[in-house]
Design a protein with these regions (language model features):
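Conserved class I S-adenosyl-L-methionine
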Residues: 1-59, 78, 180
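C-terminal alpha-helical "lid/dimerization" subdomain adjacent to the S-adenosyl-L-methionine
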Residues: 14, 23, 37-39, 43, ...
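Short glycine-centered segments of the SAM/dcSAM-binding site in methyltransferase folds
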Residues: 64, 159-161
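Class I SAM-dependent methyltransferase SAM/SAH-binding core
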Residues: 64-122
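A short acidic, Gly/Pro-enriched loop at the edge of an enzyme's catalytic core
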Residues: 121-132
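A short SAM/SAH-binding and catalytic strip from SAM-dependent methyltransferases
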Residues: 132-144
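A short glycine-rich, Lys/Arg-flanked "PGG" loop and its adjoining helix->strand segment in the class I
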Residues: 146-158
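C-terminal lobe and adjacent flexible extensions of AdoMet/dcAdoMet transferase-like proteins
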Residues: 221-227
Length: 227
């Protein structure tokens, strides 16, 4: 519980600042500086892994999608604008981050997106509920990753898609240093972390048709739950 409160506190500050949006999209001067310094990426590289993580959502998708965590919604609310027939649920542990996402949804007049505060380790949904579960930049923060993996699998329909991206250790020394000495201490990241090989083995053991790769320290993946 202490770690969860540390995470909530860290993301409360983030949710009140536009700095996070600029960093996660690598679109502002400060955001580009962080991308280069911490992640050794430029904007094109940042956009590339995000595009691959989102590639699990088909064009004209009209099913049920769960995004966890939604964060500030900077990466996905514009995408949801193109999916008016979809039934989209956005969940986050941080009410402050989710409040930013809700404001973006309101500005875009999104009528098919609902928001709920909750814990990925105990998702408040029935088994086999969603056609897609999307998780961008979440698993490196989740304090109980095993529970998160189990819950995502549980709420995903047979034949459904699990896709997203998150930090993996061991790919870039400077990034690993910042994660250990800055992001963990601030409450943004929580060990243990996956490696590329460990994540591939995990996804292969749980899902079918695993498409996965990494760009520096960010892994992206698209996989399906067996029918």
């Amino acid at each position: 519980m202490e770690r969860k409160e540390a995470i909530r506190s860290a993301y409360r500050l983030t949710g009140e600042s536009s700095f996070y949006d600029g960093m996660i999209t690598c679109s502002t001067l400060s955001g580009k500086a962080v991308c280069r310094l911490v992640w050794a990426m430029n904007k094109a590289e940042n956009d590339d892994y995000l595009e691959k993580a989102l590639s699990g959502i088909p064009e004209h998708f009209s099913g049920r999608l769960l995004e966890v965590p939604v964060g500030t919604g900077i990466l996905t609310m514009p995408v949801y604008k193109t999916m008016p027939e979809a039934d989209i649920t956005c969940l986050d542990y941080s009410a402050d981050m989710m409040g930013q996402a809700r404001e973006k949804a309101d500005r875009l007049h999104l009528k098919n997106v609902t928001f709920r505060q909750g814990d990925v380790g105990a998702l408040p949904y029935e088994d086999n509920t969603f056609d897609i579960v999307l998780s961008l930049n979440g698993f490196h923060a989740f304090p109980d990753k095993e529970a998160a993996y189990r819950e995502v699998y549980r709420v995903l329909k047979p034949g459904g898609t699990f896709c997203g991206c998150f930090y993996v250790m061991g790919e870039h020394k400077r990034t690993d240093w910042f994660v250990r000495h800055v992001y963990e201490k601030a409450g943004f990241f929580t060990p243990p972390y996956e490696t590329v090989s460990g994540l591939k083995a995990r996804l292969d053991g749980m899902y079918t048709g695993v498409d996965m790769g990494n760009l520096k320290s960010m892994a992206w993946f698209v996989c399906r739950k067996a029918e």
